[in-house]
Design a protein with these regions (language model features):
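N-terminal accessory targeting/assembly segments
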Residues: 1-82
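P-loop NTP-binding catalytic core
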Residues: 56, 64-128
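Hydrophobic anchor at the beta1->P-loop junction of P-loop NTPases
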Residues: 133
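The conserved Walker
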Residues: 137
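Conserved lysine of the Walker
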Residues: 141
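Hydrophobic positions on the alpha1 helix immediately C-terminal to the Walker A/P-loop
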Residues: 144, 148
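P-loop NTPase switch/communication element
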Residues: 152-199
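Conserved P-loop NTPase nucleotide-binding/switch module
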Residues: 203-240
């Protein structure tokens, strides 16, 4: 199987023969040349992106399911097998103050997922109390978070993951696309504050993990959870 076959399968035929082994992102904008991000640098490919090509990618990414496609457009992305993500941008449609989808799609950002493995035995000595992972965007916070979750789970801890955007687990109908360990329970689709509280009540965890803490209500929920004897593992943006 070619590298990132799950992504190649949804691309137009003219792009399926290209080598994406070093790619981090593929950006497709209507009327512009495709752009590939590799090792932090962007390079342009030949040819221009046509509107029908973006629609075709979304149809293939959702297995030609109209319901799945509409759901993807409401949340702004679709997750592929392997944990890859197709982000959507265009002319949004709103109803009662909430975005319900897109009238037209003008851009796609395809993010290439890599399940990078770190030395779990080296991580465990630092995971005795609650832990906050800080770093700049793209610094690898989520990769380190996954490794910590896996290390704790493999060591016998009961870990619950509040994965509001699905970026930690890359959950699909086939289950989590990233290995998070044998004793890990994943909640997707819920806001972090409500989701973490639900996990505390329902799943009897010893650890609760979440990605990208940004809102005050998330911090308030974490404070309340900390009073219940459960340890917390989270990430947040910070300057280098």
């Amino acid at each position: 199987m070619a590298a990132f076959q799950e992504i190649l399968d949804v691309l137009p035929g003219r792009l399926q023969t290209l080598d994406f082994s070093a790619a981090q992102e593929l950006r497709l904008r209507v009327g512009q040349a495709p752009a590939v991000l590799e090792n932090g640098r962007e390079r342009r490919l030949s040819g221009l992106v046509r509107p029908g090509e973006l629609d075709g990618i979304l149809q293939r990414a959702t297995n030609y399911s109209a319901h799945a496609c509409q759901s993807a457009l409401r949340q702004g992305y679709v997750t592929l097998p392997g944990g890859h993500r197709v982000g959507v941008c265009g002319s949004a449609v709103t109803r009662n103050g909430e975005m319900t989808g897109f009238r037209t799609v003008s851009s796609l950002c395809i993010r290439f997922a890599r399940d990078i493995r770190l030395d779990e035995t080296a991580l465990l000595p630092s995971l005795t109390e609650s832990c906050l992972i800080l770093g700049a965007p793209g610094a690898g916070k989520t990769t380190l978070l996954r490794a910590c979750i896996r290390a704790l789970s493999n060591s016998g801890e009961r870990v619950c993951v509040c994965d509001d955007r699905g970026e930690i687990s890359a959950m699909t109908d086939e289950g989590a696309q990233f290995d998070l360990g044998p004793q890990t329970d994943v909640l997707t689709g819920a806001f972090k504050s409500e989701g973490m509280t639900l996990l505390l009540r329902a799943m009897s965890p010893t650890w609760i993990a979440a990605d990208e803490i940004t809102a005050r209500r998330d911090l308030e929920a974490m404070e309340q959870i900390s009073y219940c004897g459960v340890r917390l593992l989270a990430t947040a943006h910070a300057k280098d």
